[in-house]
């Protein structure tokens, strides 16, 4: 998408040449290569990418290639106004760290984890901590066979009334502390 003329530009690419830019469109942060048909390729770390962007209501990942990402820790932490997050286009096949990924996303009332490939994830510490708006969290599609850290994974999730842990493989977990 081409950035509107009146928008305030934020240069977000690695070399600072303006090849990838971001701007706010109301409550939506948009990121673009400014080249039609070309995706933004994320670095290996998306740590804190949207952290404490409290005005964000939605994020469209259809133009972001995350296939090389290994660290998504704190990625959405503190995005308090988001009520739902569409993870359909988020490629997580190489991610090893999802700690604090949704921490303090207090507005989330719906979170479909089905699109996430968590087969390589080892750290899920505080992944859903303080997601007070979630009443139901379906973990049946999460592959946790390689996870070693699950400390405080659901800490402070005071709204959770339905949480089925029967499919959670904790055989390699060494830290489940609170």
Which residue ranges define each predicted feature?
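Negatively charged
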Residues: 1-178
């Amino acid at each position: 998408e081409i950035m509107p003329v009146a928008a305030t530009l934020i240069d977000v690419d690695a070399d600072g040449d303006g090849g990838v830019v971001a701007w706010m469109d109301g409550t939506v942060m948009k990121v673009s290569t400014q080249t039609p048909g070309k995706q933004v390729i994320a670095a290996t770390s998306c740590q804190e990418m949207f952290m404490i962007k409290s005005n964000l209501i939605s994020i469209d990942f259809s133009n972001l290639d995350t296939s090389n990402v290994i660290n998504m820790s704190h990625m959405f932490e503190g995005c308090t106004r988001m009520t739902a997050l569409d993870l359909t286009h988020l490629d997580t096949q190489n991610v090893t760290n999802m700690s604090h990924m949704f921490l303090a996303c207090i507005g989330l009332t719906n979170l479909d984890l089905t699109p996430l490939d968590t087969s390589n994830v080892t750290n899920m510490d505080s992944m859903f901590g303080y997601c007070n708006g979630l009443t139901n969290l379906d973990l049946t599609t999460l592959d946790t066979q390689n996870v070693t850290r699950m400390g405080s994974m659901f800490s402070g999730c005071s709204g959770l009334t339905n949480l089925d842990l029967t499919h959670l493989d904790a055989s390699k977990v060494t830290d489940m502390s609170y």
